[in-house]
Amino acid sequence: EYIFADAVEKEADVVITWGGLQSNWCRQTAAAAAMLGMRSILLLAKRDDSPVVADGNLLLDEILGAEIHVLEPGTNQGEVAEKVAEEERAKGHTPYVVSVGGSRTGGSLEEPLGAMGYLAAFLENHGQMASLGLEPDYMVIPTGSGGTLAGLIVGAAAAETDTKIVGISVSGSAEASKRPVAEIATQTAEALGLATSFSADDVIVFDEYVGEGYGILNQPTADAIRRVARDEGILLDPVYTGKAMAGLMDLANKGYFEEDDVVVFIHTGGTPAIFHYGEELLSYFRR
């Protein structure tokens, strides 16, 4: 919402962004661009040398009409994005360049608008919980690029609550994650005129559930997906919400939460990725 409002205000006619082949962010960007009559250019990096299969989010990107560039592993996607933007300008277009997740400033993004969206999400949830006479002790989410986690942290500070925001990393180490999240949170607070700043010490991230790496399915994640589906009828994905739920369950089993704590799990989407992992997921279910 906020990012595309900025793109419309800047009279952009093509949005350029990047992520992995099964990026939820890129798929949502393509959908929003289609709704607003803009073109979308997605720079999607392969994780390895496996064949590219049009399923999951990649299939939806095609259906949504995105122009897709598949990049080799290790490619600097930001540099490619700027090159593509220059090519679009030379053709008379007005490109809007936004990094993965939409919360790191740079390109066309002057403020961390993606994180602002999740600040608003925190305040919305806070109001809903208050109407039920509840206040969360913890809010648990998957974290990758960090914008969602940063936005929720600022939201908790803005609402002056004691809610602790817990990120379950789906990619990097906790140490590597905390400082960028704190930077995004501080930028978000500054952009909104909030007299507060954040350090790495204010960020809670657990990295024990990453497994072998980003997008690599493991048994605890598959178990969490199956349990939540069969107990609650809610679908989690293998990349983000499945790993985060596996982390939440393990933390609960280890006594991280008190028995009477109110714990909110934020489902960040990603369901289309299930179909990319179909056979692998079923093989874990059979074990």
Name each model-derived stretch:
Residues 14-26, 139-145, 234-242:
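Active-site nucleophile and cofactor-binding loops and adjacent substrate-binding regions
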Residues 45-132, 196, 201-224:
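Small/polar-residue-rich loop-to-helix segments that shape phosphate-bearing ligand pockets
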Residues 115-204, 266-287:
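Glycine-rich phosphate/pyrophosphate-binding loop at beta-loop-alpha junctions
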